[in-house]
């Protein structure tokens, strides 16, 4: 967010206290990915980028440390739909304006509906987006189905079924770019179809979604809530980058 916004006595003190400390995976510096809101469970690296899993970028339930929990299998479509339509507790499940103002730019604060959200696309708009983004004519769109989901419920392969052609897109960034003029909040969504015509073609699609961004690594809003609740920076880092270590490499 730039030096102007981030430079403050608090930031300067945080830099001083953590000088020389590096987040490590064995002898290698961690690839410390982050996104705005994981949606309750962080995503694994390989579902968003190269098929090379990283041991410290795995699925993590974003809830209080030490609380017993199970990690739902969100690669399963039935489990993913149940999770996305539900509003489970999580660090990043917050509408606290003070915390959000510390994490988000002004224009990003226009909505607090990012942990769970809805996006409506008309048949006409969906066809237009597909033509613009994919340079394809699939005909009228009949359905969109998840072919593969990651551990956070984010779709990594999406099948778009048209009257003329069926096409599969992925990974998550291509899906988000295709279904929005800019970027869909995330690819963790389920699709409801409405207003079918006489040919059975839906005239309206409602995407019910979870989270904001790719969801891999540190969840910015979750981390801000953890900080507000008194968690130390090392506990926050090791919550999101499980299996990593913080090492002092220089003074």
Features from the language model and the residues they span:
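Conserved, single-site charged/polar hotspot
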Residues: 1-251
């Amino acid at each position: 967010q730039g030096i102007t916004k981030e430079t403050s006595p608090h930031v300067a003190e945080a830099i001083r206290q953590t000088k020389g400390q590096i987040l490590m995976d064995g002898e290698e510096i961690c690839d410390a990915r982050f996104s705005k809101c994981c949606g309750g469970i962080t995503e694994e690296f390989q579902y968003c980028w190269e098929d090379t899993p990283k041991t410290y970028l795995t699925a993590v339930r974003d809830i209080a440390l030490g609380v017993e929990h199970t990690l739902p299998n969100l690669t399963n479509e039935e489990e993913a739909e149940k999770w996305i339509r539900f509003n489970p507790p999580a660090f990043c499940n917050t509408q606290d304006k003070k915390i959000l103002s510390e994490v988000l730019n002004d224009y990003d604060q226009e909505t607090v509906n990012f942990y769970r959200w809805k996006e409506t696309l008309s048949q006409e708009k969906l066809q237009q987006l597909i033509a613009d983004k994919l340079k394809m004519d699939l005909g009228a769109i009949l359905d969109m189905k998840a072919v593969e989901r990651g551990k956070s419920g984010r779709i990594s392969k999406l099948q778009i079924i048209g009257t003329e052609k069926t096409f599969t897109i992925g990974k998550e960034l291509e899906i988000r770019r295709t279904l929005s003029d800019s970027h869909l909040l995330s690819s963790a969504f389920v699709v409801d179809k409405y207003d079918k015509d006489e040919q059975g073609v839906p005239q309206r699609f409602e995407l019910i979604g979870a989270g904001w961004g790719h969801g891999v690594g540190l969840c910015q809003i979750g981390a801000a809530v953890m900080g507000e609740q008194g968690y130390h920076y090392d506990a926050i880092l090791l919550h999101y980058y499980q299996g990593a270590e913080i090492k002092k490499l220089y003074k």
